[in-house]
């Protein structure tokens, strides 16, 4: 899965980066870490197969 595909799925569901971060379990200091989702979408962090599968399940 590419960052562009993640962004397309997220926007199709009408979700914010923070909402996706919360569903995927990305937290920092008890708050959803939307910056990790932004890093995925911008290509600054690779989406591994485990996370890609989780994204597909959560955003289905």
Model segments located where?
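A short, Lys/Arg-rich alpha-helix, primarily the initiator
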Residues: 1-13
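Short alpha-helical DNA-recognition segment
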Residues: 14-38
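DNA major-groove recognition helix of helix-turn-helix/homeodomain DNA-binding modules
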Residues: 42-60
């Amino acid at each position: 899965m590419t960052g562009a595909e993640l962004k397309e799925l997220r926007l199709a569901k009408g979700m914010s980066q923070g909402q996706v971060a919360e569903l995927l379990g990305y937290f920092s200091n008890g708050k959803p870490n939307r910056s990790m989702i932004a890093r995925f979408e911008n290509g600054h962090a690779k989406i591994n197969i485990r996370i890609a599968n989780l994204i597909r399940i959560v955003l289905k």
